[in-house]
């Protein structure tokens, strides 16, 4: 009984599906017949007059497809009784396509007809076509057309399309303001745009540049709007150097007392203490940050050799470096500042050199309580952590210290489980991971494969799965829940192998080896790419940069870009958002 019941139930479901498919076929067939009747002008009861073109149709079909025609034909409007209905300000080809859609549910939307179709679909209230046009335009938004699409969406009451266009404008403002569309905007739209907190910029000087570009495009006619436009620039957020060298020298500013007052107000802001600055609200709200990640390399043993590497265009940019020579030091980046710690000349260096990438300025702070070289460092939540190292030729240390960037004070934390120097250390998801290294810098110092993790919340260390290969002087980077150990050396020589630690699984796995063996590897990761920018092979240095794609497990040797010439350099990823363009020029 039960089995037959199941069979009957299954049979009913199958019959329903077949009936639904058959119904769809029948409906398509009916509409196909009606469309043929329309083309043959059979039983048509209305003619749409569009300019000089006559388009026959059936009222019931138009009324079903369009709320506009539904109201026209079912109310007491004059057109409800007219055989010919004139559609003013309409394009014949577009109306033909909409009528065709009413019968077939098919329409071709492309870059040539989308604006006209959207306008007509909006006017005649044909929602499916309107949605198709909106979806098409959302996919086409770019820097050259986003402003026009935003205006169109506003005029045609398409909030979803406007939101997409506006979000693109704000996200890509630094590209948008350099287009012809931006220069041709009216003063109301420019003023509104420059006032947005959500403009994504590297620094406020880009907003200033946008304002000046717009004013100069038609200077005689836009002169009366100068104060209103420049009032939207947040001068206190512009660097003091840019204000004095570029803004103050601009003829537009010099010739206008009101604009000069804005610049002076911005310069005064830089003279205030941090406490007094916090009390100011007007003109100091930050914009949305446009992250600009670069890799900074500092000469170490050759301090005059300091550069940025830009992974977007593979360019090198010099950094002004006045600090002294350091051997086997470490560097980290936090909140616009690069901290250079440890290292030695004849003796360990006690001072910590600091470089502000936004202000392009150097200054010094008190370094780690225990001066040493061959240490490792990383940053997390406003704190700089240093681990291990050695005190000039001595055995490796268990030491673990922390510098609080807010209070500018050093604190000794619980020691590592294993003494180590020439190791790697990275922050990942709020935890501090330490991998590899050796027991000392002398020949007898055993190379390690051990790993451990520190939890700042509990101030405890936990031993982890060891690396497959013991290594020191290797690169160590964190990419998407994986920690990659790149090259380095074991007790026998240089390594080309690469392995990663899966944080979730607590295990190491080998991946594709480097196309080069590195006794010392200097690498950093931006996005999913690991860049090896410097290194030493034992008999020579790395000639050209190497790239490793962590998603495809592929290495590329870039023969067009020379590697950094100093193999004992320091390396870290920095965010130059906020830095003046002149500072970053190649």
Swiss-Prot record:
Coiled coil: none annotated. Pfam families: BACK, BTB, Kelch_KLHDC2_KLHL20_DRC7. It is found in: Nucleus; Cytoplasm. Disulfide bonds: none annotated. Widely expressed, with highest levels in adult and fetal heart, CNS and adult testis. Residues 44-111 form the BTB domain. It is linked to Perching syndrome: An autosomal recessive multisystem disorder characterized by global developmental delay, dysmorphic facial features, feeding and respiratory difficulties with poor overall growth, axial hypotonia, and joint contractures. The features are variable, even within families, and may also include retinitis pigmentosa, cardiac or genitourinary anomalies, and abnormal sweating. This is Kelch-like protein 7.
């Amino acid at each position: 009984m039960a089995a037959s019941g199941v069979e009957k139930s299954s049979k009913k479901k199958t019959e329903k599906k077949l009936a639904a498919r058959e119904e769809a076929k029948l409906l398509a067939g009916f509409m196909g017949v009606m469309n043929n009747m329309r083309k043959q002008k059979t039983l048509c009861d209305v003619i749409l007059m569009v300019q000089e073109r006559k388009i026959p149709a059936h009222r019931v079909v138009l009324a079903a497809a369009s709320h506009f025609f539904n109201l026209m034909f079912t109310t007491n409007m004059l057109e409800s009784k007219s055989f010919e209905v004139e559609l003013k300000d309409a394009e014949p080809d577009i109306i033909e396509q909409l009528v065709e859609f009413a019968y077939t549910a098919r329409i071709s939307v492309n870059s040539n007809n989308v604006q006209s179709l959207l306008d007509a679909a909006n006017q005649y209230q044909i929602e499916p076509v309107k949605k198709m046009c909106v979806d098409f335009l959302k996919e086409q938004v770019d820097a050259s057309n986003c402003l026009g699409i935003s205006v169109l969406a506003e005029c045609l009451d398409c909030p979803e399309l406007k939101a997409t266009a506006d979000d693109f404008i704000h996200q890509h403002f630094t590209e948008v303001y350099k287009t012809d569309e931006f220069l041709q905007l009216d003063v109301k739209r420019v003023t509104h745009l420059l006032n947005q907190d959500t403009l994504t910029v590297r620094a406020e000087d880009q907003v200033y540049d946008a304002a000046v570009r717009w004013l100069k495009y038609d200077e005689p006619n836009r002169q009366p709007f100068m104060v209103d436009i420049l009032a939207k620039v947040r001068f206190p957020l512009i660097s003091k150097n840019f204000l004095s060298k570029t803004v103050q020298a601009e003829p537009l500013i010099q010739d206008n007392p009101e604009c000069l007052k804005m610049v002076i107000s911005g310069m005064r802001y830089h003279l205030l203490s941090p406490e007094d600055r916090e009390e100011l609200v007007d003109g100091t709200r930050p914009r949305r940050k446009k992250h600009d990640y670069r890799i900074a390399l500092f000469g170490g043993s050759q301090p005059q050799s300091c550069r940025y590497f830009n992974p977007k265009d593979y360019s090198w940019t010099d950094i002004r470096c006045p600090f002294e020579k350091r051997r086997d030091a470490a560097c980290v980046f936090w909140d616009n500042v690069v901290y250079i710690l440890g290292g030695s000349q004849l003796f360990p260096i006690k001072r910590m050199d600091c470089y502000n990438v936004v202000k392009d300025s150097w200054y010094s702070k008190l370094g780690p309580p225990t001066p040493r070289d061959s240490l490792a460092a990383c940053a997390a939540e406003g704190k700089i952590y240093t681990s291990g190292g050695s005190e000039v030729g001595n055995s490796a240390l268990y030491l673990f210290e922390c510098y609080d960037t807010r209070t500018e004070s050093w604190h000794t934390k619980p020691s590592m489980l294993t003494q180590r120097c020439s190791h790697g250390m990275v922050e990942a998801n709020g935890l501090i991971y330490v991998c590899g290294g050796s027991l000392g810098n002398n020949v007898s110092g055993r190379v390690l494969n051990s790993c451990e993790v520190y939890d700042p919340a509990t101030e405890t260390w936990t031993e982890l799965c060891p690396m497959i290969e013991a290594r020191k002087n290797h690169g160590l980077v964190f990419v998407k829940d994986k920690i990659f150990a790149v090259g380095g050396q074991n007790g026998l020589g240089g390594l080309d192998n690469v392995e990663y630690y899966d944080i979730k699984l607590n295990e190491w796995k080998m991946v594709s080896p480097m196309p080069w063996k590195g006794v010392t590897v200097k690498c950093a990761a931006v996005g999913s790419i690991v860049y090896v920018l410097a290194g030493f092979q034992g008999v020579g240095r790395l000639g050209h940069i190497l790239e490793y794609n962590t998603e495809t497990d592929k290495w590329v040797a870039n023969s067009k870009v020379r590697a950094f010439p100093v193999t004992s350099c320091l390396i870290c990823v920095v965010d130059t958002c906020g830095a003046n363009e002149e500072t970053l020029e190649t």
